[in-house]
């Protein structure tokens, strides 16, 4: 990590650690074991970025409630993607919104099968509820995959521009 950071630090806005450890019902590792092993190793991994005051994001799919305190202790700044099938992003924002920037949560099922109006309404809701106080980056709950109609992705993006401006909600 140090070599990568030394080479690219000035060009990067943040560092993303992609480490899927969860599924819809919980962690794929015993929480006690996770707490014992993860913090020390992750602190060492992200130390070069933190030394240069870079933001560090953590990505994992699945239910995250048990790991937020650990992510906080390690020093992560951003959490991605807060899957809606496993996490109530509004409750996460209430509890952890002062500590982390939150990314994602627009269901890929909605993007795959929803109407443009349904997508627009969901984005509006998220911008209204997640926007106050900042710290939210609208995005999908996982990767934009094959099978998501391009027009639905465009609808999400347009709605984000329409509703997602801090301080000017709905005034594009």
Which residues does each PLM region occupy?
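Active-site loop segments of alpha/beta catalytic cores
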Residues: 1-172
């Amino acid at each position: 990590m140090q070599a990568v950071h030394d080479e690219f630090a000035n060009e990067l806005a943040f560092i993303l650690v992609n480490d899927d450890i969860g599924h819809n019902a919980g962690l794929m590792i015993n929480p006690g074991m996770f707490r014992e092993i993860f913090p020390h190793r992750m602190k060492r991994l992200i130390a070069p970025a933190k030394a240069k005051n870079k933001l560090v994001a953590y990505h994992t799919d699945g239910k995250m409630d048990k790991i937020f305190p650990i992510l906080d202790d390690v020093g992560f700044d951003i959490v991605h993607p807060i899957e809606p099938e496993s996490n109530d992003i509004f409750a996460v924002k209430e509890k952890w919104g002062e500590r982390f920037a939150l990314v994602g949560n627009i269901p890929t099922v909605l993007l795959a099968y929803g109407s443009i109006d349904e997508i627009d309404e969901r984005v509006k809701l998220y911008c209204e509820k997640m926007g106050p106080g900042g710290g939210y980056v609208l995005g999908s709950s996982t990767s934009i995959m094959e099978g998501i109609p391009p027009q639905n992705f465009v609808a999400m993006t347009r709605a984000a521009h329409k509703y997602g401006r801090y301080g000017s909600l709905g005034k594009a």
